[in-house]
Amino acid sequence: IVYNANHLFGFFSLFNGDALRSVELVKGGFPSRYGGRLSSVIDLNMKEGNNKKFAGEVGIGLISSRAVFEGPIVKGKSSFMISGRRTYLDALAQPLIMAASQGANAGYFFYDFNAKANYILSEKDKLYVSGYFGRDKFYFNQNTANTKFKTNFGWGNRTLTARWNHQINPKMFANASAIYSHYDLSINVLQKDANSDEFELKYTSNINDYGVKYDLDYRPNPKHMVRTGFSTINHQFSPSAIVLKVGTNFNLDRKMSVINTYESGVYIEDQWRERKWNFYPGVRISHYVVDKTQYLKPEPRMSFAYNVRKDIAIKGSYALMNQYIHLLSSTGIGLPTDLWVPATTNVKPMQSQQWATGIAKDFKKGFSLSLEGYYKTMNHVITYKEGASFLLQDNFFDPSVSVNNKAWESQVTSGRGWSYGSEVFLQKQVGKLSGWVGYTLSWTQLQFDAVNNGIKYYAKYDRRHDASVVCIYRLSKLFTASMTWVYGTGNAITMPQGYLRGTGHYPTTMPEIWDPSNQAFNNEMIDYGKRNSFRMAAYHRMDIGLQFKKEKAHGIKTWELSVYNVYNRFNPFFYYGQLNDAGTIRTLKQVTLFPIIPSLSWTYKFR
């Protein structure tokens, strides 16, 4: 379980393809074995490692490097797999990033590691141990005539899983797992003015999960596959730890106590095949405990598929799901900040109901086409109240007063949401030319009595249009050309209409310039207009690549020439407001991380 499934807020996949054996994306028709979330599920299986001989792959490029190694620990009985990657766009692309970001100095990099070991205990027993560690780093520096400003964002996941696989009999298998997961976010802000006055803010937040699960698969006959099991997780939330310094006059060190919650679930599901029909009925019962409050929620699931002909199939599904962890997202301009908080006695868990239907058809020459539609309702979603933030809790900046670890509840409000749309996907899998074209038309709206005068508005991640085109052309056995184009409607954000200084939330003077962190931490009193009434510019880009492979006696060498963002689109990562030297006029600025970036890489796969 990971809390941030992407690098750089969705620009890169969190998962290294070199370490994966299979990936399954579940967008609808959720099986009962999945719980705890309202949205799509990505089910990953890592490579087990070669238990016969040592093998691997090493890639070195201008913007990133990667490596994967696998081999036997005890030949024929146990094996290992380890992989890692690291980008260094921040170093090589710095001049391009500064030009695209209107002079601001911004940079980003990430690194991650995957490892797995497995051991065959007996003919019926296997033991697996796997782990993941990943970290993202983003920085933004800006100098004006009067001030110097620096901010650093860091966030990361790490997981560790031990799994025992046991064959009870030829028709029944069991998996018992112990799971640890950690997520943390840190933000550092430092500002100096011409008089050497300093403002410094350090913020950290983290979650630790300790869980166990047991899954049992039973196939009584070829038509049925019954799955059942249970899981329980202890979530330990550390909502925030803050160090605040304003000059030499004020020093605040706040650390909230840990919030312990317990989430459990038991499920049963069946895969039933009958001629042209496939049925997938199931139910999950979820249970959640926080302090002295308990929630017990049934979650019925049902999906089906019907093969009209060999080349045409239709499907439909219904799922009710509950989520006991809330994601609080910033809504205005500035750095995108997402904070995880638990359901409590006063903040109820989210619940959704989703209906989906679709049709798929296979054509000649390897073409396939699918069309799907969905409708989802959501209850008890939360957002910040107007002008609120995680730090503006009662007495938060008074060192003499203790702060309750649930004081943030006063800064949020609960409401409803709706999400609906349709997707079309055309794919070609055979021949010299392969690839796909995908398009999604969707709407996501929210409504809160205490926000936007109770009027519905579009959610931050409402994306009206989302399109992707991927083409792979095999010129020969040695040469392959590729092209990717993506497009997405910009995020909906709230644009400030005006600003007031000296709110009294800080005990001394405020920072002299407005900066991206002010939106995140609300260091100014902001006059907001309608919620999420402004759209960031659309995100789109084209990437091209050319690969040349050459087989050697002990492996394959690959040279790749690629260009990221071919037409040099300045896609916005975030906006911020900048005061002029006189401090009287604000200008909206844009930070772009990745303009056009050419790259050359070399990969060697040995076997």
PLM feature segments, named:
Residues 149-167, 255-261, 322-379, 397-423, ...:
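Outer-membrane beta-barrel signature, preferentially recognizing the C-terminal barrel domain
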Residues 61-86, 100-137, 152-180, 220-223:
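Transmembrane beta-barrel wall of Gram-negative outer-membrane proteins
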Residues 56-62, 82-88, 129-135, 176-182, ...:
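Transmembrane beta-barrel strands of outer-membrane/channel proteins
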Residues 9-13, 28, 33-55, 67:
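N-terminal periplasmic accessory domains that precede
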Residues 137, 184, 238-246, 292, ...:
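Surface-exposed extracellular loop regions of Gram-negative outer-membrane beta-barrel proteins
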Residues 2-25:
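Short acidic/polar hinge/loop motifs at secondary-structure boundaries
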Residues 375-377, 396-397, 402-495:
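Gram-negative outer-membrane beta-barrel transporters
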Residues 379, 478, 487-523, 535-543, ...:
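C-terminal beta-signal and adjacent terminal beta-strands/loops
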